[in-house]
Amino acid sequence: MDVNPTLLFLKVPAQNAISTTFPYTGDPPYSHGTGTGYTMDTVNRTHQYSEKGKWTTNTETGAPQLNPIDGPLPEDNEPSGYAQTDCVLEAMAFLEESHPGIFENSCLETMEVIQQTRVDKLTQGRQTYDWTLNRNQPAATALANTIEVFRSNGMTANESGRLIDFLKDVIESMDKEEMEITTHFQRKRRVRDNMTKKMVTQRTIGKKKQRLNKRSYLIRALTLNTMTKDAERGKLKRRAIATPGMQIRGFVYFVETLARSICEKLEQSGLPVGGNEKKAKLANVVRKMMTNSQDTELSFTITGDNTKWNENQNPRMFLAMITYITRNQPEWFRNVLSIAPIMFSNKMARLGKGYMFESKSMKLRTQIPAEMLASIDLKYFNESTRKKIEKIRPLLIDGTVSLSPGMMMGMFNMLSTVLGVSILNLGQKKYTKTTYWWDGLQSSDDFALIVNAPNHEGIQAGVDRFYRTCKLVGINMSKKKSYINRTGTFEFTSFFYRYGFVANFSMELPSFGVSGINESADMSIGVTVIKNNMINNDLGPATAQMALQLFIKDYRYTYRCHRGDTQIQTRRSFELKKLWEQTRSKAGLLVSDGGPNLYNIRNLHIPEVCLKWELMDEDYQGRLCNPLNPFVSHKEIESVNNAVVMPAHGPAKSMEYDAVATTHSWIPKRNRSILNTSQRGILEDEQMYQKCCNLFEKFFPSSSYRRPVGISSMVEAMVSRARIDARIDFESGRIKKEEFAEIMKICSTIEELRRQK
């Protein structure tokens, strides 16, 4: 029979139909090749927005720099970065007037954080520009390399010290006349293979010492490496994002700590909270505006969009904000916080890998590295690239570009939110001194503006005033992309509001399904996603039950673990059938071992092993939870793991799921091909680092881990801990006298070896 599709919506309120408009099936686009072109675009655009500023030259690096601050007031609607210092300071003063003590309290909180933060905070985070090797590395490795270089150059760096002490070293390093670093390089030799008697290329990794003079070191310390942002939907062109080096990261972290603390106290800020908490916060602002718009008043909301938020922001403006916010604070604190914006005012952008050329006729490919762009003949490039390179040439130094204005993506999200909120704050009647007034929401570059006024002219005047006020601090509301509606319907950070926030369940669709980590984690993540969507996204019981059945089906097809009594033939079915037949209690078999599914929407919170434990045969229990099983190298798992789930929009989210370690929690082995590349030395360093950390965690279980252990080294801390634990175990009779003596002997030997070293 034919179903009329409109019948589906008869009983559904219009706002719930949003989940049917989901456009993002299929994979998002990824970038290939180099990001050099995108980075040049960013640099050229940023300079264009600030072109009427003043040019100066950095005395240390010789880099030309453009300063648009206090530049000409705008005469048209073109985006521009000419923020006026006095306007920004005044906005800050009014923000403080509306929230007495907010800056003072946030400064106190931040000082406390600065005193307590350990340098290992910087190991969090993904790719980081490693200035010693001049390319990207995992954060932990980049930090270890930096500390190693600092130490060999006579600084006091310490892996377990405070972050503030590491930052003192960074400052000191900038005053040094030269820095000695160790770089990796590759040697290739042609040798004859004994077995096959063929000639093969053998690669060896060499480490060599290199001296950087002050200028070269400063350029590297101020460099942000660039890459292309991947998986961005709904865009025709890719764009560049920045990864800063270790010198900048620590300073940025403290500035963002201060700004986060301020944002937490501002009701208009969409950061740093998320999820339901964010929705509640935002709903409050809307409610306030709607209740206050008496029957005589009109209320309109703009779903706002800003033009090139980052490229029109300016680090010098952030410096002014910080100077004001910390004005009554101790000198050291003000200095620490002002370094990040100063470094950003002098930043250099690395152009990435450069361009790839290929000649179709001669079947040749060659890479033109970014360093060569300053001197290469431009006749080889097409029209648009030629224009880009010409524009950028005056700014080039050693393959990096001087980029003083602009902020690069994702660097000061919290602080720029504070700036945005300070303009929303000026919408109160006591500041507008007229019949219209405004309020709104701000989250990084995204905003929603609610304007109330007695008539349409008032609304228009309010919007105009907001627009112009923003211009004065370098915020450019896009008139083309912003949309105005009667209050009650708008969008903010992909939340859709219609008389309350609408659960847009379809946004979570990409995270349903089998993650592909391993059988154990995938089962756990799959049911947790369904559980979370029932809690947060209006996923109803019937739909959830269906989602669960689809997930189990998907899971069985992925791991070829159909029920033991099924007719489906796969590579595993022979083994699974055998297991099924010799198992007394078939309900106890995990789904991944061909067992039945016992999940329903009431027990999604229980890990499968726990759900079925009582139903399992004893020998099956023994095989399943056997840490000595030689066929499985599985990790030791804390009770909670983190999975990365991909919603359709916005960044990948981290989601906790329960992890029970079984022989199904295997880890796939690392691809061997890396061992023949220049990465090998780094891989060995990384494994060393990993081993040390794992060992340390064995001595200091998670409760005491990451607590300051004085300034003793990791080894000293572990030895003293081992002695204490051994004594306690010996006195309580858990270990014998011989064992106790042996432990003490090992400890002494370790100390002796350290002394000799």
Swiss-Prot record:
Spell out the residue ranges making up region: Disordered: 50-82
Could you tell me the EC number(s) of this protein? Answer: 2.7.7.48
Catalysis performed (reactions): RNA(n) + a ribonucleoside 5'-triphosphate = RNA(n+1) + diphosphate
Per the Swiss-Prot or TrEMBL annotation, the motif Nuclear localization signal is positioned at 187-195, 203-216
Q: Chief localization class?
A: host cell
Any Pfam family hit: Flu_PB1
- InterPro entries recorded for this chain? RNA-dir_pol_NSvirus (IPR007099), RNA_pol_PB1_influenza (IPR001407)
Segments for region (Promoter-binding site): 249-256
Which residue ranges have biased composition labelled Polar residues? 55-64
> What keywords appear on the UniProt entry?
Eukaryotic host gene expression shutoff by virus, Eukaryotic host transcription shutoff by virus, Host cytoplasm, Host gene expression shutoff by virus, Host nucleus, Host-virus interaction, Inhibition of host RNA polymerase II by virus, Nucleotide-binding, Nucleotidyltransferase, Phosphoprotein, RNA-directed RNA polymerase, Transferase, Viral RNA replication, Viral transcription
Top enzyme category: transferase
Statement: the UniProt record of this protein carries the keyword Phosphoprotein: yes
* Domain of life of the native organism: Viruses
Under the heading Gene3D superfamilies, the entry gives: 6.10.140.720
Which BP terms does GO give this entry? Answer: DNA-templated transcription; symbiont-mediated suppression of host gene expression; symbiont-mediated suppression of host mRNA transcription via inhibition of RNA polymerase II activity; viral RNA genome replication; viral transcription
Q: Where in the cell is it found?
A: Host nucleus; Host cytoplasm
Q: How does it assemble?
A: Influenza RNA polymerase is composed of three subunits: PB1, PB2 and PA. Interacts (via N-terminus) with PA (via C-terminus). Interacts (via C-terminus) with PB2 (via N-terminus); this interaction is essential for transcription initiation.
Q: Which family does it belong to?
A: Belongs to the influenza viruses polymerase PB1 family.
Q: What does this protein do?
A: RNA-dependent RNA polymerase which is responsible for replication and transcription of virus RNA segments. The transcription of viral mRNAs occurs by a unique mechanism called cap-snatching. 5' methylated caps of cellular mRNAs are cleaved after 10-13 nucleotides by PA. In turn, these short capped RNAs are used as primers by PB1 for transcription of viral mRNAs. During virus replication, PB1 initiates RNA synthesis and copy vRNA into complementary RNA (cRNA) which in turn serves as a template for the production of more vRNAs.
Please identify the protein, giving its name as recorded.
RNA-directed RNA polymerase catalytic subunit
Tell me the name of the encoding gene: PB1
